[in-house]
């Protein structure tokens, strides 16, 4: 089967917790399909998270597969205090006091982790506790004591530190707490790839975190978690300044009516797709798999519909953090994604308000060319990830191989729909980088000889969003290998010689292919871009002269003069000692 037939485009974010923090479990999660790991800083110590990060990086390196790490900051989550006699049960009609005073919890009162509670929550406000399992209404307020006197509308059980939400009440709490700042400093020092900001209300919340990251001298992308009613109202402005977005349906389903959550999810996904930023759909996607080996039909439909809506990634929380079946949960999610993508009528997505931006036009053209030519893959050269993201946002049905010299960029691209990142040392020219990318893709079994690929890049080095080049190319095959004397990638026409008279018309830049050389070949070697010899000695005449003239030599290539045809175009990767058959290239420069 081709890479196009087996490639999974939807990414999977798995939360690391006590059930999955060991190297062996992390390895199994990656092999099952996880592409990014989430660390929830509402739980665990810095020591715990450091250990998890080290394990993730170690396993990722061993598997030679870039894997992203997402640091999820706790944010200003408002919680109950501790109940002195354990969990309490409240019934409809019961009176209950919430206070900012530090008191031990009882069946009649509990402290709450918000100092200006009584000043900001008005009489008549609805309060949701423990994700809406318990509901109260404020009947009276005592600002001096900091008390809210409430009546229970929906009863239930409450225990220590459960969350408290105030739908339709605008609280003046900052989105970044002191704990978040401390956790952020730690995460940046550990090299996390993404920082998720909880309870975002305004674009200024996102910009505050971006400023903190910039001031640290580190580099991480910011995901805005949409879980407040204010964030829904400010959706466009928030998504315009963040690097990614998470549809955090848990708190969002308490902040707004639950029946509005699917509509908000679709709006968020559509907006993120238009802006070209990755979107994660999260919370209770396969929640029953915390304790059961099979997902419910409703959960499977939930994951499927998020993929159909256009989400870049789907996320597992408790399922992998503390669940009994973390590997099965990832495998289930991966199977759903593959099945839905196979069934979907994958086609290029029109983007509204695209404007006249050249990178957008080129990226859309790349996808259309790839579709028309039925290409095996789209190959993008990208140093910042911008080129790959631009192509991805048009949702081409062709796999996108994103080649980058930056391993952190590769890890971030593991959140982007349809993108397979490849890490490759940057070479001097786009042509050399393209050739090296195709060689690597063949070694990874992503492409085979004869595949047609469409490639894109920016001709301006190190400038994000400068995509302006399209190439159509057939993948060449490996024809031989030897021992390299030199480095880099060389292209040229092969000239096979058995005698120096065979190459009297040798042209500058051609590749000399010969059993062995002698003094009669010195002037030919001087013109050559490279020399291939069957002779294996590192002290041979070709090696000595090649070193003296600065000409790379590939030695010990068995029967080179037999299997290489005179005049055949070749590419030699001296970094790996590999010879590739020539390729046909059409360049479309804009």
Question: Residues of each region from the PLM?
Answer:
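Expand to "…catalyze enediolate/carbanion chemistry for C-C bond making/breaking, isomerization
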Residues: 1-23, 30, 45-48, 54, ...
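Conserved alpha/beta-domain cores
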Residues: 6, 14-18, 169-275, 279-283, ...
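Structural preference for beta-strand elements that scaffold enzyme active sites
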Residues: 11-13, 36-38, 66-70, 95, ...
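Conserved, mostly hydrophobic/aromatic
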Residues: 15, 40, 72, 124, ...
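Glycine-rich phosphate-binding active-site loops on the catalytic face of alpha/beta enzymes
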Residues: 16-18, 35-46, 196-199, 245-256, ...
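Glycine-enriched alpha-helix->loop->beta-strand junction motifs that scaffold or abut catalytic
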Residues: 31-36, 189-193, 213-218, 240-245, ...
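Acidic, glycine-rich flexible loop/linker segments
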Residues: 76-177, 440, 446-501, 505, ...
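ATP-dependent carboxylate/acyl-activation modules
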Residues: 94-95, 236, 269-273, 280, ...
């Amino acid at each position: 089967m081709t890479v196009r037939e087996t490639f999974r485009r939807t990414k999977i974010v798995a939360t690391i917790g006590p059930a999955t923090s060991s190297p062996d479990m992390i390895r199994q999660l990656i092999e099952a399909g996880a592409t990014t790991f989430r660390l929830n800083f509402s739980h665990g110590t810095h020591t715990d998270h450091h250990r998890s990060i080290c394990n993730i990086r170690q396993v990722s390196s061993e598997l030679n597969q870039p894997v992203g790490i997402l640091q999820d900051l706790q944010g200003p989550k408002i919680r109950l205090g501790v109940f002195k006699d354990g969990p309490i049960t409240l019934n409809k009609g019961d009176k209950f006091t919430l206070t900012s005073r530090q008191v031990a919890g009882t069946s009649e009162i509990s402290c709450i982790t918000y100092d200006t509670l009584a000043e900001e929550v008005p009489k008549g406000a609805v309060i949701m506790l423990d994700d809406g399992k318990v509901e109260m209404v404020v009947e009276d307020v005592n600002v001096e004591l900091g008390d809210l006197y409430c009546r229970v509308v929906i009863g239930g059980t409450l225990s220590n530190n459960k969350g408290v939400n105030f739908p339709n009440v605008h609280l003046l709490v900052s989105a970044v707490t002191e704990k978040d700042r401390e956790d952020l400093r730690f995460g940046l020092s550990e090299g996390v790839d993404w920082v998720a900001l909880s309870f975002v209300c305004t674009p200024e919340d996102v910009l505050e975190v971006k400023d903190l990251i910039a001031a640290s001298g580190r580099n991480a992308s910011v995901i805005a978690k949409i879980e407040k009613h204010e964030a829904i109202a400010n959706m466009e402005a928030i998504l315009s300044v963040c690097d990614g977005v998470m549809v955090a349906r848990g708190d969002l389903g308490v902040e707004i009516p639950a029946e509005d959550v699917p509509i908000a999810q679709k709006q968020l996904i559509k907006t993120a797709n238009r802006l070209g930023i990755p979107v994660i759909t999260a919370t209770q996607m396969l929640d029953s798999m915390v304790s059961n080996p099979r997902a419910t039909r409703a959960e499977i439909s939930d994951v499927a519909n998020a993929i159909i809506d256009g989400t870049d990634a789907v996320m597992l929380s408790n399922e992998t953090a503390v669940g009994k079946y973390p590997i099965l949960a990832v495998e289930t999610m991966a199977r759903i994604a593959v099945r839905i993508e196979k069934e979907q009528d994958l086609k290029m997505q029109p983007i509204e308000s695209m404007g006249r931006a050249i990178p957008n036009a080129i990226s859309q053209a790349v996808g259309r060319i790839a579709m028309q030519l039925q290409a095996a893959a789209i190959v993008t050269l990208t140093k910042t990830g911008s080129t790959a993201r631009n192509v991805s946002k048009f949702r081409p049905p062709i796999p996108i191989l994103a080649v980058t010299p930056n391993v952190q960029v590769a890890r971030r691209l593991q959140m982007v729909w349809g993108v397979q990142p490849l890490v490759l040392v940057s070479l001097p020219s786009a042509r050399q980088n393209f050739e090296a990318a195709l060689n690597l893709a063949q070694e990874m079994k992503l492409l085979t000889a004869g595949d047609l690929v469409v490639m894109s890049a920016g001709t301006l080095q190190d400038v994000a969003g400068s995509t302006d080049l399209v190439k159509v190319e057939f993948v060449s095959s490996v024809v031989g290998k030897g021992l390299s004397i030199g480095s880099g990638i060389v292209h040229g026409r092969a000239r096979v010689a058995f005698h120096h008279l065979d190459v009297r018309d040798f042209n500058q830049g051609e590749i000399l292919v010969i059993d062995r050389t002698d003094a009669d070949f010195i002037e030919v070697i001087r013109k050559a871009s490279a020399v291939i010899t069957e002779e294996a000695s590192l002290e041979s005449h070709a090696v000595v002269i090649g070193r003296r003239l600065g000409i790379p030599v590939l030695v010990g290539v068995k029967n080179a003069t037999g299997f290489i045809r005179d005049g055949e175009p070749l590419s030699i990767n001296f970094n790996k000692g590999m010879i590739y058959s020539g390729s046909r290239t059409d360049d479309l420069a804009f």
